[in-house]
Amino acid sequence: GEIDWAKMKQQGMDFAYIKATEGSAHEDKRFDKNWKEAKAAGMLCGAYHFFSFESEGAKQAEHFIKKVGDLKGSLIPVVDVEYYGKYAEIPPDVEKVRKELREMVGALEKKYGRNGFSDWAHSSAQ
């Protein structure tokens, strides 16, 4: 739905993470609008990616980077990893997920720098 970013800022919200991408092909159709409006309202913004168990980590990183581009002056990128669909009942292989997540984090780190992102992600993936 629509978000009134100015109202969110008035209510004391100082930052927002906005969904940009999912998997290796999906883009959130509201990302550009939400990003622009949240920044115009004076909020510090960060972009996040919804991790897919069906796509290679490197391809997901490439997709995210292509969509969001330069993130200077923004919050560090976030990768949202959670069980969805059939994986809620039958979780994916942990080692495969770790491998793909490490590849994604490595590519994001190469593009955006460490800034604590890698330390958190690597410890969480172990």
Question: Where are each of the predicted segments found?
Answer:
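Substrate-binding cleft of extracellular glycoside hydrolase catalytic domains
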Residues: 1-112
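Aromatic-lined carbohydrate-recognition surfaces of secreted/lumenal glycan-active proteins
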Residues: 109-126
